[in-house]
């Protein structure tokens, strides 16, 4: 088989399973997640070594990213409460951003595994659901820590008959977050894989560049919505 066709082969729904305590884990997702965490750890180390009062070099870049995340949190959550949520939103944004870009830029397809293929961690629904559930837990924590059990009064405001709708909303938020991210990243990698198989030289390049752009947008959308949900939980309801 043509080597390009082997690289372009798309394996949908196939997984490299690891057995742990009687449970099957998606091994390829854990491998690529560790790669992403390793990249973030290295970048963090480089950005926090030999700090200077007047930043230069890589410190400039890390401070720019930190300011961007801080401004995002401030815009979405508000002046009063945003600082304590900067680490959470920063972690979510950076993990998704690097995960998405790793799928677009790293040559995962050149690495053979016993079954399935390596891809961005966010290409697996388990990863995106976990991130969405963390977001749900965070906004419940935000609301309860500020208002106590009075937080749950929001379910019957402005009228008691809205209770089922308000409860349903808490289930649809993580669903929409997880499926939006998963669908976009999976679709991008499938389109690139098919185009590489059909026209392997030039045509896939613009699609790959578009994928890099949309990958960054998806990380921003996820972090922005997470901040908006936290702000909603913290806000006073009347």
Swiss-Prot record:
Sorted alphabetically, which Gene3D superfamilies does this protein's record hold? ATP synthase, F0 complex, subunit A
Major localization class: plastid
- Tell me where the transmembrane regions lie: 27-47, 86-106, 125-145, 190-210, 211-231
Pfam entry (one): ATP-synt_A
**What's the protein's topology in the membrane?**
Multi-pass membrane protein
Which cellular component, as a GO term, is one annotated location?
chloroplast thylakoid membrane
What outcome is documented for mutating residue 49 to S in this protein? Answer: In strain: CC-503
Which PROSITE patterns would you find in this protein's record? ATPASE_A
Q: Name one GO molecular function term.
A: proton-transporting ATP synthase activity, rotational mechanism
Keyword Transport among record annotations: yes
Q: Which compartments is it annotated to reside in?
A: Plastid, Chloroplast thylakoid membrane
Q: Which UniProt keywords are present, listed alphabetically?
A: ATP synthesis, CF(0), Chloroplast, Hydrogen ion transport, Ion transport, Membrane, Plastid, Thylakoid, Transmembrane, Transmembrane helix, Transport
Q: Other comments? A: In plastids the F-type ATPase is also known as CF(1)CF(0).
Q: Which family does it belong to?
A: Belongs to the ATPase A chain family.
What NCBIfam families would the database entry show?
A: ATP_synt_6_or_A (TIGR01131)
Question: What quaternary arrangement does the UniProt entry report?
Answer: F-type ATPases have 2 components, F(1) - the catalytic core - and F(0) - the membrane proton channel. F(1) has five subunits: alpha(3), beta(3), gamma(1), delta(1), epsilon(1). F(0) has four main subunits: a(1), b(1), b'(1) and c(10-14). The alpha and beta chains form an alternating ring which encloses part of the gamma chain. F(1) is attached to F(0) by a central stalk formed by the gamma and epsilon chains, while a peripheral stalk is formed by the delta, b and b' chains.
**Entry function:** F(1)F(0) ATP synthase produces ATP from ADP in the presence of a proton or sodium gradient. F-type ATPases consist of two structural domains, F(1) containing the extramembraneous catalytic core and F(0) containing the membrane proton channel, linked together by a central stalk and a peripheral stalk. During catalysis, ATP synthesis in the catalytic domain of F(1) is coupled via a rotary mechanism of the central stalk subunits to proton translocation.
Q: What is this protein called?
A: ATP synthase subunit a, chloroplastic
The gene behind this protein is: atpI
């Amino acid at each position: 088989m043509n080597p390009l066709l082997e690289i372009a082969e798309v394996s949908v729904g196939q997984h490299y399973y690891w057995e742990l305590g009687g449970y099957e884990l998606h091994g390829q997702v854990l491998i690529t997640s560790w790669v992403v965490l390793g990249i973030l750890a290295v970048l963090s180390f480089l950005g926090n070594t030999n700090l200077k009062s007047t930043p230069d070099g890589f410190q400039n870049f890390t401070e720019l990213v930190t300011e961007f995340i801080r401004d995002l949190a401030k815009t979405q959550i508000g002046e009063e409460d945003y600082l304590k949520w900067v680490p959470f939103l920063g972690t979510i944004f950076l993990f998704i951003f690097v995960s998405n870009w790793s799928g677009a830029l790293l040559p995962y397809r050149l690495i053979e595994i016993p079954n399935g293929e390596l891809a961005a961690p966010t290409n697996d629904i388990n990863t995106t659901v976990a991130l969405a559930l963390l977001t749900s837990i965070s906004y419940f924590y935000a609301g309860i820590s500020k208002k106590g059990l009075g937080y749950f009064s929001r379910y019957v405001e402005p009228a008691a008959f809205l209770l089922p709708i308000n409860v349903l909303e808490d289930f649809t938020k993580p669903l929409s977050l997880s499926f939006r991210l998963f669908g976009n990243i999976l679709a991008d990698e499938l389109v690139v894989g098919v185009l590489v198989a059909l026209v392997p030289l030039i045509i896939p390049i613009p699609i790959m560049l578009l994928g890099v752009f949309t990958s960054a947008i998806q990380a921003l959308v996820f972090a922005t919505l997470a901040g908006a949900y936290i702000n909603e939980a913290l806000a006073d309801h009347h």
